Amino acid sequence: MRLASRFGRYNSIRRERPLTDDELMQFVPSVFSGDKHESRSERYTYIPTINIINKLRDEGFQPFFACQSRVRDLGRREYSKHMLRLRREGNINGKEVPEIILLNSHDGSSSYQMIPGIFRFVCTNGLVCGNNFGEIRVPHKGDIVGQVIEGAYEVLGVFDKVTDNMEAMKEIHLNSDEQHLFGRAALMVRYEDENKTPVTPEQIITPRRREDKQNDLWTTWQRVQENMIKGGLSGRSASAKNTRTRAITGIDGDIRINKALWVIAEQFRKWKS
């Protein structure tokens, strides 16, 4: 379920309008990298990510969020991994907005990858759909631009299915025991060993805002996702010391958790249908 890329802490920018090239240059300079990293072979086809973005812009997709991983080796800064979330023009605002997640690097650590996602405005959470909705990978060879554009439309083609599943989850009620089970499953994704989880399932399913107090499957998932990604929950460590859960600040970890939570939610949807 993990992506073929590893992101640590990162620089990021988010706007509720299309990002400009100046903003991208300031926060994700690797998007404009002028050449491949010296470690790449002659077979590696190099195309700056900004060229891909401009082609996607021509097709009606605009970036609203961008981030780039921080690297210790400054020589790799211009080639480091980056992620952009793009929305279809005309579908910018709304409670939940479908997005295309584009990942890439020019140091050989990642191919182009595109994944369907959803942005939830009420809590500014970026959700990532599970593997069953498709994940497009384009290696750095051949007609990269054409394959990425084709992949973008493939991802766009599953948005209706994503929306249908989301609406179905909103209609499924979970009782307190079922919500507890969802929280327990989510904690196992993060900590693996139930004896090492610093917080309880009850904490992870607790809402942070009034509008998230509903007991449907979709809202339960949103509560769990936000609590896990943002952290800050009081708990006890394995050595019985007071602690707080850490926010997930790495992009790779964010996407891994998100995709796993989508799979759990899908399993609950099928179980309750």
Task: For the regions a language model picked out, list residue spans one by one.
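Amphipathic, interaction-prone secondary-structure segments
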Residues: 46-112, 262
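Generic detector of bulky aromatic hydrophobic side chains
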Residues: 44, 68, 222-226
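Intrinsically disordered, low-complexity regions enriched in serine/threonine
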Residues: 1-9, 90-97, 102-273
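Functionally constrained cores in energy, signaling, and assembly domains
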Residues: 20-21, 30, 34-35, 80, ...
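General structural signal for secondary-structure boundaries
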Residues: 16-25, 31-32, 47-51, 55, ...
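Intrinsically disordered, low-complexity regulatory segments
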Residues: 1-47, 54, 58, 265, ...
